[in-house]
UniProtKB/Swiss-Prot annotation:
UniProt KW keywords: Chaperone, Cytoplasm, GTP-binding, Nickel insertion, Nucleotide-binding
Family: Belongs to the SIMIBI class G3E GTPase family. UreG subfamily.
Residues holding GTP: 42-49
Organism of provenance: Anaeromyxobacter sp. (strain Fw109-5)
Function: Facilitates the functional incorporation of the urease nickel metallocenter. This process requires GTP hydrolysis, probably effectuated by UreG.
Transmembrane region(s): none
Protein name per its UniProtKB record: Urease accessory protein UreG
Gene assigned in the entry: ureG
Length: 236
């Protein structure tokens, strides 16, 4: 019986963190219980749900997929994905986290684990996406929940966001800087963002994207597939 009471504490919630201290992905022997899981996190409005939709569209013809979304008090993100035909409705589940969305992906992952395991049992997906509720830069997925993590920030917050650090920015397996088309409008310098992201993440990968326009999506999907193949021991 899997212990759903696993808690990861706040060990990575203090300080900016670093990419090489992130708790690297590890081979997990129970992929039949819970399929390879990609955690998608980031602040409110950064484009997490749009990215999940884009990745479903990019991968659904070649891979069996499922999605679990997290919202504080609604099922809005799951309903958006169903409405936009990301996947058949039965492959999309919603978890209502209450007022503390980061706890559901880090301190007490019980509800998300159950939803992911139920999807795995019902549909035998190869890849699951777990989208967190919108939260701050300190929120980051527990490795008990996500085998691979993507953190989404957007240019609308200004070019200062990457250098603020926080575990999401420094320790996600992939950082996505979304909405690059807004840079001029908000006075953000993409070169500054690229430099600061590299400084905060070392050699951790960063993709600059316009998710709703498809820009950067193939590259992001490529990172996901590479991690999946590595996890299942398939040739890259």
């Amino acid at each position: 019986m899997h212990d759903h009471s696993l808690h990861s504490g706040h060990d990575h919630g203090l300080g900016p963190g670093s990419f090489h201290d992130r708790g690297a992905p590890h081979a997990r022997g129970d992929l039949r219980r819970r399929a390879f899981t990609v955690g998608v996190g980031g602040p409110v409005g950064s484009g997490k749900t749009a990215l999940v939709l884009a990745l479903c569209r990019a991968l659904r013809d070649s891979r069996s997929l499922g999605v679990v979304t997290n919202d504080i008090f609604t099922r809005e993100d799951a309903e958006f994905l169903v409405r936009n035909d990301a996947l058949p409705a039965e492959r999309i589940r919603a978890v209502e986290t209450g007022g503390c969305p980061h706890a559901a992906i880090r301190e007490d992952v019980t509800a998300n684990l159950l939803a992911l395991e139920e999807l795995t049992e019902a549909h035998r997906p190869e890849i699951l996406f777990c989208e967190s509720g919108g939260d701050n830069l300190a929120a980051h997925f527990s490795r008990e929940l996500a085998d691979y993590t993507i953190y989404v920030i957007d240019v609308a917050g200004g070019d200062k966001v990457p250098r603020k650090g926080g575990p999401g920015i420094t320790q996600a397996d992939l950082l996505v800087v979304n909405k690059t088309d807004l840079a001029t409008a908000v006075g953000a310098d993409l070169d500054v963002m690229a430099r600061d992201a590299a400084r905060m993440r070392g050699d951790g990968p960063v993709v600059f994207a316009q998710v709703t326009r498809g820009v950067g999506v193939p590259e992001i999907a490529g990172h996901v597939l590479h991690a999946y193949r590595h996890a299942v021991g398939a040739p890259h």
